[in-house]
Amino acid sequence: ADRLWQGTALETLVYHELRVYNEVSRKHRALSYYRTPAGVEVDFIIEAAGRRSESPPRVVAIEVKRAERWDRAWDKPMRGLAETKGIKVERMIGVYCGPRSYQFDNIKILPLAEFVKALFAGEIY
């Protein structure tokens, strides 16, 4: 139960940082999550740019995990979203508690502190 609580707390912390950045940057982008009827989820979906009615929404997908090592299985929901018609996933980012950042294909994996630094530098959206 402690691990579940810690995971929820970490997601809440990331949500808070996204909300603060959204406000101080005056971007005011929509923040949401993605869930399929089968229960597959992506923690955060952020509008990457203002939506034009003739084009599909462009988004950034973020998955947050309370883990010291990134498991490639956690990429699957973001990849599934990227394959969905009618939406354009511009960036996929994994946030975790490990020590290093790396890239798997088109998914960037960042330690929490690096993610927050990149967020406030305007590098996430």
Predicted regions, residues:
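A cross-kingdom feature that marks ATP-driven nucleic-acid transaction machinery
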Residues: A1-Y125
